[in-house]
A protein has these predicted regions:
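Extended, charged coiled-coil "arm/hinge" scaffolds of SMC/Rad50-like chromosome-maintenance ATPases
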Residues: 85-100, 190-211
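Active-site phosphate-binding and catalytic loops of NTP-dependent enzymes
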Residues: 37-43, 65-69, 130-146, 239-250, ...
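ATPase nucleotide-binding head domains, primarily ABC-like/P-loop NTPase cores
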Residues: 247-250, 255-493
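Extended, Lys/Glu-rich alpha-helical coiled-coil stalks
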Residues: 16-23, 47, 207, 214-218, ...
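Amphipathic heptad-repeat alpha-helical coiled-coil/stalk segments that mediate oligomerization
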Residues: 1, 55-105, 153-156, 160-165, ...
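Extended, Lys/Arg-enriched charged tracts that mediate electrostatic binding to polyanionic substrates
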Residues: 113-163
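Conserved amphipathic alpha-helical "coupling/scaffold" segments
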Residues: 1-111, 115, 220-223, 227-233, ...
Length: 516
C-alpha cells in the first residue's frame, strides 16, 4: 500500500509539472493476440487497436523523457515507463497502410495503388459512356432521371419500365413500384466485367496486406500484452492522481500504532467548497468514539468520512485532509449505516441492524475499523441503550477502533466514566437553528429540543412542564454539558483568533523583510 500511495503522490507531481499524460482508451486485446498466436490474420479494426497501443507507448515514453523530470523523485513510476515497448517502424508502416476501420490506404502496397488507379480510370470510362446515353437526344426520354448508379456492384442507369426494350443491356434491379428498371447497357458490359475483376484483385491484395501487417506483430505479442497492462496501470495511477488534485488531497502517513489522525478531513463526495472540515483523532488515548447530538447534525457524515478516508488510504488513494494526517492499515472495515430493513426477510429496522452487528462481532479482529450508525436504535430505549453499551464494550475489549453515533443519554454517561471511550458531538448553532457540522471531540451532544422549541416560539409553560418531567440527574448532566460546550466553544474561538493573529504577524514580518 505504501508503494501505491507513493505512485499516487508522484503522479500528482508529474501532472502538475508536465500536464496530464497522453493515455487514451484502449481495447481488450486478448482475442487479437490469440489470433496472432494462431498465425491468423487480423481485421483492420484489430490492427488499429494494436497500433494505438504501440503509439501510446511511444507517446508515454516521450512524455516521461522531459529533462526537468530529473529534478524530482519518480522512482515509483519509472519502471512502468521504462518497461513500455516501442516499435516506431511498425507504427510508421501501419500509419502508411491504414486510413480508418473501413479503409486501407493506396500506399499500403505498390500493387494496391496500381489496382486502384486502374479502377478509377475504368470507372471514369464507364461514367463517360453512360452519360453519353443519359444526355443523348435519342435515349434521354427513356430515363427516369439523369443518374448513374450501381446495382449488384455494376454501373447501371434508371430506365422507365415501358422503355426497357429500347436500351440493349442487362436488367439488374427493379424499383419497388415497378416503374423503373436498372439496366447495364451492353456498351459498358466489358468495362464492368473488367472493373469486377479488379475489385476481386483489390480484395485479395487487401487480404494479403492484412496478413503481412498481422505478421509484423506476431513476434511481439508478449510485448503488446505487457504494454496494455502497463498502460492500464498508468491510467489507474494517474486517475488517482487527477482525483487527488481535483479534491486537493494529501498523502496520508501510515502508522503502525493502530491510530487515526485526520486533520481537517473532508467527506470526498460532498462539494469541497461547501463541506466543513473535521479533525478526528482515534486510537491514541481511546479506541471507541461515541458521537451524539440531534438529527441532521452531521453525525453520519462524520462517520462516513472516517470510513471513506480509511478505505481510500488503504486503496492507495490520497485523502481529502491536510498534510500529516495519519491512518492505520486496517485488516477490515465494517460499517452498519442507514436503514437496511428487509421486506423479503420480514426483518424490522432493529433486526436488520442487529443481523449486521452479529456478522461484525463474529468477523472483526483487533485490527479492524468498525463504524455503526445509531447503535441499539429501533427497539425499547432502555434495552437498546444497554445493548449498545455491551456491544461497544465488547469491541473495545477486542481492541478494534470503533466509531458509533447515538441519541442515548446512557451512552454519553458511560463514555464519560469508562476508559478507552470518548464522547464527541457535532456543533449546533442555536441562534440560527442549524448545525455547523464542526466535530467537537470530548463533548457529548445535546438534543437541544427545549432550546430549539423556545427559539421557534413554543409556549414557555409547555417547555417548563416538559422540563420538569426530566429527572434531576439528567438535568444536571445537561447543565454540565452546556457549561463544557460553552467553555470549549470559547476556547476554540480564542484559538482561532490567536492563529489568525499569528498568521498576520508572520505576513507583516515577511513584508518588512522585503522592504529592507
Amino acid at each position: 500500500m505504501q508503494k501505491s500511495l507513493k505512485e499516487t503522490s508522484q503522479g500528482v507531481v508529474l501532472i502538475q509539472r508536465n500536464s496530464t499524460p497522453p493515455i487514451g482508451e484502449i481495447a481488450d486485446i486478448t482475442i487479437y493476440l490469440k489470433t496472432l498466436d494462431g498465425c491468423g490474420s487480423l481485421s483492420i479494426k484489430a490492427l488499429i487497436e494494436l497500433q494505438n497501443i504501440l503509439q501510446m507507448a511511444e507517446d508515454l515514453k516521450e512524455y516521461f523523457s522531459k529533462d526537468f523530470l530529473s529534478t524530482s523523485d519518480f522512482s515509483a513510476l519509472e519502471p512502468y515507463f521504462n518497461d513500455l515497448y516501442v516499435n516506431q517502424s511498425i507504427v510508421s508502416t501501419f500509419a502508411r497502410s491504414i486510413i480508418d476501420e473501413d479503409n486501407i490506404a493506396d500506399t499500403a502496397s505498390a500493387k494496391l495503388q496500381d489496382i486502384r488507379r486502374k479502377e478509377r480510370r475504368i470507372e471514369q470510362d464507364i461514367r463517360a459512356k453512360l452519360n453519353v446515353i443519359l444526355h443523348s437526344s435519342t435515349y434521354s426520354k427513356y430515363m427516369r432521371e439523369n443518374l448513374v448508379t450501381i446495382r449488384s456492384g455494376r454501373y447501371v442507369i434508371p430506365v422507365k419500365e415501358e422503355y426497357r426494350s429500347s436500351i440493349k443491356g442487362f436488367v439488374h434491379d427493379v424499383s419497388s413500384s415497378g416503374s423503373t428498371v436498372f439496366i447495364e447497357p451492353l456498351v459498358v458490359f466489358d468495362l464492368n466485367n473488367e472493373l469486377s475483376n479488379l475489385h476481386i484483385e483489390e480484395e485479395q491484395e487487401i487480404e494479403r496486406i492484412l496478413q503481412n501487417l498481422s505478421g509484423l506483430l506476431f513476434p511481439y505479442t508478449k510485448e503488446l500484452q505487457n504494454n496494455a497492462e502497463l498502460i492500464g496501470k498508468l491510467d489507474f495511477i494517474f486517475g488517482k492522481a487527477r482525483y487527488s488534485i481535483d479534491l486537493n488531497c494529501s498523502t496520508p502517513e501510515i502508522n503502525k500504532q493502530k491510530q487515526i489522525n485526520l486533520i481537517n478531513a473532508r467527506h470526498p463526495l460532498i462539494d469541497q467548497e461547501k463541506v466543513v472540515p473535521s479533525s478526528i483523532e482515534l486510537g491514541k488515548d481511546f479506541n471507541v468514539l461515541i458521537i451524539t447530538g440531534p438529527n441532521t447534525g452531521g453525525k453520519t457524515v462524520t462517520l462516513k468520512t472516517i470510513g471513506l478516508l480509511s478505505a481510500m488510504a488503504c486503496s492507495g488513494l490520497n485523502i481529502p485532509a491536510d498534510e500529516h494526517s495519519s491512518i492505520y492499515v486496517f485488516d477490515q472495515i465494517f460499517a452498519d449505516i442507514g436503514d437496511e430493513q428487509s421486506i423479503s426477510e420480514s426483518l424490522s429496522t432493529f433486526s436488520s441492524h442487529m443481523s449486521n452487528i452479529v456478522k461484525i462481532t463474529s468477523q472483526a479482529t483487533e485490527n479492524s475499523l468498525i463504524l455503526v450508525d445509531e447503535l441499539g436504535s429501533g427497539t425499547d430505549p432502555l434495552e437498546g441503550a444497554n445493548l449498545a453499551i455491551s456491544i461497544l464494550q465488547y469491541f473495545s475489549e477486542l481492541g478494534a477502533i470503533v466509531v458509533s453515533t447515538s441519541h442515548y443519554q446512557e451512552l454519553k454517561k458511560y463514555a464519560l466514566v469508562t476508559p478507552n471511550f470518548k464522547n464527541a458531538s457535532v456543533e449546533f448553532d442555536i441562534e440560527n437553528l442549524r448545525p455547523t457540522y464542526k466535530l467537537l471531540v470530548g463533548i457529548p451532544g445535546k438534543s437541544n429540543a427545549f432550546a430549539i422549541s423556545r427559539k421557534l416560539g413554543l409556549d414557555e409553560k409547555i417547555i417548563n412542564r416538559a422540563s420538569s418531567m426530566i429527572d434531576k440527574e439528567t438535568i444536571n448532566l445537561e447543565d454540565l454539558l452546556k457549561n463544557i460546550y460553552d467553555s470549549k466553544s470559547e476556547i476554540e474561538k480564542e484559538k482561532e483568533l490567536t492563529s489568525q493573529a499569528l498568521q498576520e504577524a508572520k505576513e507583516l514580518k515577511e513584508s518588512l523583510k522585503h522592504q529592507n
